[in-house]
């Protein structure tokens, strides 16, 4: 039997006693991350009926669940992830790497020449435990997401992305400011206090 580290025991204790974990189970969301998007949307109204959006790194699907609920039948939600994701009503899911041409071709066929109103991205790399390496890999994913957003968003569109404060943060913020009229930071209550994660919201794509 494997012996758990102190850090993994602490995480498990925190998870079991987490208010948002219990809420997610009660409300039918696949992960507590749903409440981060709900809180941001309550403030910024980036998702509303009729919104056309893409959810990058969507699995297990809590953000796509929220998006489908908020866009309603008049909106469109595309979800992309390398990992499998169980079907969600109102969500068109593509399993694959959005950097690859065949995956982009599938997405663009579904998009049918419509520009996106919004791109959302709650991706994070598999953590190795090496802080420097993990931070670099995290921002690499963020850069890929920003490139995707810059190519597919309509003029005036928005981009919401999770980043981790540290090396590369200021440079990434500057890159977003070149593409969007405004860039704001958001730290939802559902984000754990000990986490360095923060969300950047770019609005009014140039």
UniProtKB/Swiss-Prot annotation:
GO terms for cellular component: cytoplasm. S-adenosyl-L-methionine binds at residues 61, 63, 81, 97, 122. The active site is at 162 (proton acceptor). It is found in: Cytoplasm. Keywords: Cytoplasm, Methyltransferase, rRNA processing, S-adenosyl-L-methionine, Transferase. It comes from the Bacteria. The keyword rRNA-binding does not apply. SUPFAM superfamilies: S-adenosyl-L-methionine-dependent methyltransferases (SSF53335). Coiled coil: none annotated. Its main location: cytoplasm. Its EC number is 2.1.1.166. Pfam families: FtsJ (PF01728). Gene3D superfamilies: Vaccinia Virus protein VP39. The keyword Transmembrane does not apply. InterPro entries: RNA_methyltr_RlmE (IPR050082), RNA_MeTrfase_FtsJ_dom (IPR002877), rRNA-MeTfrase_E (IPR015507), SAM-dependent_MTases_sf (IPR029063). GO terms for molecular function: rRNA (uridine-2'-O-)-methyltransferase activity. It catalyses: uridine(2552) in 23S rRNA + S-adenosyl-L-methionine = 2'-O-methyluridine(2552) in 23S rRNA + S-adenosyl-L-homocysteine + H(+). Specifically methylates the uridine in position 2552 of 23S rRNA at the 2'-O position of the ribose in the fully assembled 50S ribosomal subunit. Belongs to the class I-like SAM-binding methyltransferase superfamily. RNA methyltransferase RlmE family. This is Ribosomal RNA large subunit methyltransferase E. It comes from Neisseria gonorrhoeae (strain NCCP11945). The gene is rlmE.
């Amino acid at each position: 039997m494997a012996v758990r580290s102190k850090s993994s025991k602490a995480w498990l204790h925190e998870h079991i006693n987490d208010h948002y974990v219990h809420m997610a189970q009660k409300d039918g969301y696949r992960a507590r991350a749903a409440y981060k998007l709900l809180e941001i949307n309550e403030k910024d109204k980036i998702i509303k009926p009729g919104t056309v959006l893409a959810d990058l790194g969507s699995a297990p699907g809590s953000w796509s669940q929220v998006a489908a609920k908020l866009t309603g039948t008049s909106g469109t939600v595309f979800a992309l992830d390398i990992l499998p994701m169980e079907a969600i009503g109102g969500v068109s899911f593509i399993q694959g790497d959005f950097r690859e041409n065949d995956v982009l071709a599938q997405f663009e066929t579904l998009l049918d020449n419509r520009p996106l109103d919004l791109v959302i991205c709650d991706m994070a790399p598999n953590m190795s435990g090496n802080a420097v390496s993990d931070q670099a890999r995290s921002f690499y994913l963020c850069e890929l997401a920003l490139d995707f957003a810059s190519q597919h968003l309509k003029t005036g569109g928005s981009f919401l992305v999770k980043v981790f404060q540290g090396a590369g943060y200021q440079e990434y913020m500057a890159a977003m400011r070149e593409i969007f009229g405004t860039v704001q930071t958001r730290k939802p209550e559902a984000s754990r206090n000990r986490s360095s994660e923060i969300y950047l919201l770019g609005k009014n794509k140039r």
